[in-house]
Amino acid sequence: MKLLLDEEISGKVAERLRDRGHDVMAAAEDPGLRGLSDPDLFDVAQRQGRALVTYNRADFEPIIREYAAMRRQHHGLVIVHPMRFPSWEFGRMAAALEGLLGRAELGRSFLIWLQESGA
């Protein structure tokens, strides 16, 4: 699984995961992705075959509902709760995402809330 981290998620999370061999991009690190609208960022993730990771449930859930209504598949959406994974605790978020990266059973068009690794 490949990931694209939404702009509000630290590039340090992506850096840690890349250091461990994972294919992860962060919008915060890419001037071409910073400032994109949520639908445009989701489209980029789909074109690149990436699940999108975001704190922004309110804007991205309607996008995946629209995909479902049109019977279009997507590469997944991972919602991060800001109270469980504050932005300054990027190591914990990276560890939880690494646990998720090995889960082939998720398949396509999944929506998942990020949990602590091992939980």
Residue ranges and their predicted role:
Residues M1-E7, G11, E15-R18, L33, ...:
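Acidic, PIN/NYN-like endoribonuclease modules and their adjacent C-terminal/linker elements
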Residues G21-D30:
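Short, basic, glycine/proline-bearing loop/turn elements
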Residues D30-R34, R50:
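Short, surface-exposed loop/turn motifs that are enriched in glycine and acidic residues
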